[in-house]
A protein has these predicted regions:
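Rossmann-like NAD(P) dinucleotide-binding subdomain of oxidoreductase/dehydrogenase enzymes
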Residues: 47-186
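N-terminal Rossmann-like NAD(P)+-binding subdomain of aldehyde/semialdehyde dehydrogenases
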Residues: 1-55
Length: 187
């Protein structure tokens, strides 16, 4: 199973978490991400604005998405960023953290194989090759991509926000979403 193979490799390369914890995170997070996106429109007409009659929300591809990866969670972040990019008809380039460059390459190669098996161009997702993985290569990618996403520490997020291109960042202590059906029961 690819999950076990990738989790073991991620643990051995990064020394973060246990292999079992990484397997659990791969299963839970990638499944949740897919379930959130499945069946939702991501391009074209999305909805009408309630408070602005006649105004419609339209979604369109942004182009090539540069994705800066963390060392702590390379597999799941690659999967999530890749799913979001491709679902919205974008391509993406993965910039691995240097301490997770080999498992990141392996993950992207597996995703590329599956994309090609579905009849789509494998080049919808690409990775900075391990031998070229560096801050300079990541900075060049950020400057060339149409929009960038960073997941990681403050330095990575700052690099995305400072590169002169639109960017989204999430780092330590940030949360992208909280979903709670009954918030009245929270302590």
């Amino acid at each position: 199973d690819a999950r076990e193979e990738l989790a073991l490799e991620a643990h051995n390369e990064t020394h973060y978490c246990t292999t079992a914890m990484k397997i659990s995170k791969i299963i839970a997070t990638t499944t949740a991400q897919w379930n959130i996106m499945r069946g939702k429109k991501s391009v074209g007409y999305i909805k009408n604005l309630r408070d602005e009659p006649g105004v419609r929300v339209m979604a369109k591809p942004m182009g090539v998405v540069g994705c800066v990866m963390p060392s702590t969670n390379p597999i799941v972040t690659i999967a999530a960023n890749g799913m979001m990019s491709i679902k919205c008809r974008n391509a993406c380039i993965i910039a691995p953290h240097p301490s997770a460059k080999n498992v990141s390459k392996k993950t992207v190669d597996m995703v590329r194989k599956e994309i090609a098996a579905l009849g789509a161009p494998a080049d919808l997702i690409q990775v900075i090759e391990p031998e070229f993985c560096s801050v300079q290569a990541t900075d060049e990618m950020l400057a060339q991509c149409d929009v960038n996403i960073a997941t990681g520490g403050p330095g990575m997020v700052k690099a995305v926000y400072s590169c002169g291109r639109p960017g989204f960042g999430v780092g330590q202590g940030n949360c992208q979403e909280i979903i709670c059906d009954d918030y009245e029961d929270l302590d």
